């Protein structure tokens, strides 16, 4: 039996955050011309969690099989965010920008881009292949929970996540997450099992 499985957990628990400083993350002209697997994470802010997971397996034989499974958990619980007066001459702005990146890829690409606090993003892929097999199964599932989040703002929250001129000419699978703000949860799950 060829089995590929991804099990992943992301948790933000009981964090206390006082935001006064700006935060920036930028990608430009990156991750191009790749054959195979590409995992890209770009984050600006605080307590952001990002993951790219890939599991691949193969087998051969008349009594073999192929199984692929993805399971995930994302949990934000008991977090307190305070957006206070910025330091003099600055702002509490949080920016994550991606430009002219992740292009001309053959294979699998998982991309996460986040600006803010407590954002959770993940791209999971499980691939299983068996030749002359008698069985193929694929499954994907999980849980996302936001609970007990407290936000205090003395100024407007200023977060921007932008993607321009990117993710072009990709052959295969693409999982893309783009988020700005607080406690956003995003998942792309792909589970494939094949016999031939």
Where in this protein do the model-derived segments appear?
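Low-complexity repeat regions of mature extracellularly deployed or surface/particle-associated proteins
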Residues: 1-196
